[in-house]
Amino acid sequence: MVEERLNELELELVNIEYRKENKEQFLRVFIDKDNGVDLDMCSQANRAIKESFDEQEIPYDYLEVSSPGLDRVLKKERDWERFSGYRVRIKTRKSFPGPQRITGILLGFDSENIAVELEGELLKVPREMITIIRLHPEF
């Protein structure tokens, strides 16, 4: 339902977090668009999402809508395509025989691996060994 409302606004649902903090329920919704989102888009999305959650009677104390940020999590193949060539940080499972934290340039992916350039070398990390991939911008 939320994704449909966001699609009507030509926005993409990136992630939803539902967290309890100090006895209050926070609902955080992360949205994006190919050329980014601004405050006005977040406000429009907030109204649409609030309407949707109220209709479904989903309990929450605070609703926050924002962009996924500069260090966004890359979850979908669409994200990996979009951010190919960007610097990323990958965390791997403890059972991975290589490094647990990898920072390099995202080169691509296939059905089994994520390819990263690490210090001039190609490293293929099995997808099932990855716990999280984030953009890792340099400042």
From Swiss-Prot:
Locations listed in the record: Cytoplasm
Principal subcellular localisation of the protein: cytoplasm
Pfam families to which the protein is assigned, alphabetical: DUF150_C, RimP_N
Cytoplasm keyword on record: yes
Domain of life: Bacteria
Keywords: Cytoplasm, Ribosome biogenesis
GO cellular component: cytosol
GO annotation terms (biological process): ribosomal small subunit assembly; translation
Family classification: Belongs to the RimP family.
Reported function: Required for maturation of 30S ribosomal subunits.
The name this protein goes by in its record: Ribosome maturation factor RimP
Organism: Syntrophomonas wolfei subsp. wolfei (strain DSM 2245B / Goettingen)
Lineage: Bacteria, Bacillati, Bacillota, Clostridia, Eubacteriales
